[in-house]
Amino acid sequence: MGGGRGLLGRETLGPGGGCSGEGPLCYWPPPGSPPAPSLRASLPLEPPRCPLRSCSLPRSACLCSRNSAPGSCCRPWASLWSEPPPSPSSQPAPPMYIWTLSCAPAASWAPVTHWTDHPLPPLPSPLLPTRLPDDYIILPTDLRCHSHRHPSHPTDRLLLLVIWTHLGGIWAGHSPWTVIQTAGRPPRDLSPSARPISSPPPETSCVLA
């Protein structure tokens, strides 16, 4: 499995095409590549998979990455949303690219979807898009992934949606989602249960609570 750490769409490319901490930076997707299919268009595709034995999380909370081995502890994309996808006659979802945070060799992480210069995508309720500035990210409270760079860069103003498969954490009166600002420290009004990373390094940092 790759042990590289994503840097907001940039990865270091090691021998054999894997991620490593050394080597020149490469950009993914490559310049000029066609846009990835929308989330709604990808719903009928085979759901992502992650390893059963090497996953450090409970089966119900197993998150998937592109580096994962064959297995089946992940749910179809359609089950990640609390509401059914809109009908095909409605406005299509904005183009998107799917990235992966590979923060530790022994763990599998959820894909991170970047939207740039597009309207806010449909979000799982009870989130309200009007409350989400374009420099905030949405995180499940059971997983802290804080994307951060010094100094801040205009490309950091992305809406990052971490797709969370651990739907068992949703119950009445509780929202599993946490909003964290991508530049600087998280706002002080986060709930105590969020326990955000207070001083992230100038790279993607992931910690399990």
From Swiss-Prot:
Keywords, in A-Z order: Cell membrane, Lipoprotein, Membrane, Methylation, Prenylation
Main localization category: membrane
Subcellular location: Cell membrane
InterPro entries to which the protein is assigned, alphabetical: CAAX_1
Residues lipid-modified (S-farnesyl cysteine): C206
Positions of post-translational Cysteine methyl ester modification: C206
Claim: Membrane is one of the keywords in the record: yes
Region Disordered: start-end pairs: 182-209
Cellular component terms per the entry's GO annotation: plasma membrane
Top-rank lineage group of the source organism: Eukaryota
Tissue-specific expression: Ubiquitous.
Pro-piece positions: 207-209
Membrane topology listed for this record: Lipid-anchor
Protein name: CAAX box protein 1
Gene for this chain: RTL8C
